[in-house]
């Protein structure tokens, strides 16, 4: 997982996003009417809050709103009333009516978001491509970090979206579940959070499970070794568990094993003596460090961290 935050200022992103909504007055009127009809929710919002304001709440405010909204509805102990409230706000914050607009906004480089691989697993490229007619084909799902079904108020909030692959976005993996079970956890481990440190606090590790296999033969097959994780912050195990990253990365051992076998059996001095290339050039040819970095090749964090251990 990696952070997905615009390189633009929050002010610029918010302004550009709101410019895509042309019927703000009508939107705000419907929202005000719904709040009047749902006094249970009114207390969750600062006085004078307009419906359009929620579309640009920063992620920490969205987390507060999401958890407070769900607690308020759960405390009602009235399923019929909960459904009534949810239905009112779902009709206003209708994601299906704005789905393509949101995906186009996220994929527009002018808005400062970089989309290359699924932010949850980094196993699949979701960048898309340009069709022959010049139109951009978008291959990613705009996933709600905070579920729109259980809190419709966050359904259109631009700081609640990340690009994901279908596998991560749908059940039985993430589906409608939030990342983390508390406000603190969700703020810490979500890709929309500036405090997310998955890249530094979680490392892929190489476990040798069969020490009888000779070193130079170990990575010829997928037997005798596995990919696992180590944590500086144990909170991130929730991410690894939710997206079944251990199982999914081990399913890719053939890919990683080719590079591990190559490095394990590499005699760089012999290559240099019999080549016109420098050591750095040989390593680049064999392991594509710079090329993969430039191309944002999927699975690269795992590949590099495993190679460091061989």
Where are the regions a protein language model picked out?
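Aromatic- and glycine-enriched beta-alpha-beta binding-site module
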Residues: 160-171
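Domain-level detector of nuclease and nuclease-like folds
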Residues: 152, 171-237
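N-terminal accessory alpha/beta regions
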Residues: 1-105
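Short cysteine-rich loop/turn motifs with clustered Cys
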Residues: 106-139, 165-167
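C-terminal, charged low-complexity interaction regions
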Residues: 2-37, 77, 219-310
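Histidine-centered nuclease catalytic patch
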Residues: 125-160, 174-178, 184-188, 192
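Short, flexible, mixed-charge glycine/proline-rich loop motifs
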Residues: 102-114, 153-158
């Amino acid at each position: 997982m990696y952070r997905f935050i615009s390189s633009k200022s929050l002010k610029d992103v918010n302004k550009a996003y709101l410019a895509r909504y042309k019927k703000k007055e009508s939107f705000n009127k419907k929202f005000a009417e719904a709040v009047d009809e749902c006094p249970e929710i009114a207390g969750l919002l600062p006085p004078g809050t307009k419906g359009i304001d929620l579309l640009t709440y920063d992620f920490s405010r969205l987390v507060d709103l999401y958890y407070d909204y769900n607690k308020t509805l759960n405390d009602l102990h009235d399923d019929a009333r909960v459904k009534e409230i949810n239905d009112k706000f779902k009709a206003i914050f209708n994601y299906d009516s704005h789905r393509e607009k949101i995906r186009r906004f996220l994929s527009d480089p002018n808005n400062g978001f970089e989309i290359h691989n699924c932010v949850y697993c980094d196993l699949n490229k979701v960048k898309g491509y340009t069709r022959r007619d010049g139109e951009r084909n978008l291959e990613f799902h705009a996933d709600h970090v905070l579920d729109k079904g259980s809190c419709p108020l966050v359904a259109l909030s631009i700081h609640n979206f990340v690009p994901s692959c279908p596998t991560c976005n749908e059940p039985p993996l993430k589906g409608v579940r939030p990342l983390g079970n508390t406000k603190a956890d969700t703020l810490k481990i979500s890709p929309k959070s500036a405090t997310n440190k998955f890249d530094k606090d979680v490392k892929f590790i190489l476990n040798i499970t069969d020490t009888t296999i000779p070193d130079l033969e170990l990575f010829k097959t997928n037997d005798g070794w596995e990919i696992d994780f180590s944590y500086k912050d144990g909170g991130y195990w929730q991410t690894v568990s939710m997206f079944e990253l251990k199982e999914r990365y081990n399913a890719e051992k053939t890919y990683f094993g080719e590079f591990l076998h190559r490095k394990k059996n590499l005699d760089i001095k012999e290559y240099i003596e019999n080549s016109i290339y420098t050591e750095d050039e040989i390593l680049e040819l064999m392991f594509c460090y710079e090329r993969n970095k430039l191309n944002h090749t999927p699975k690269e964090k795992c590949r590099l961290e495993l190679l460091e251990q061989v």
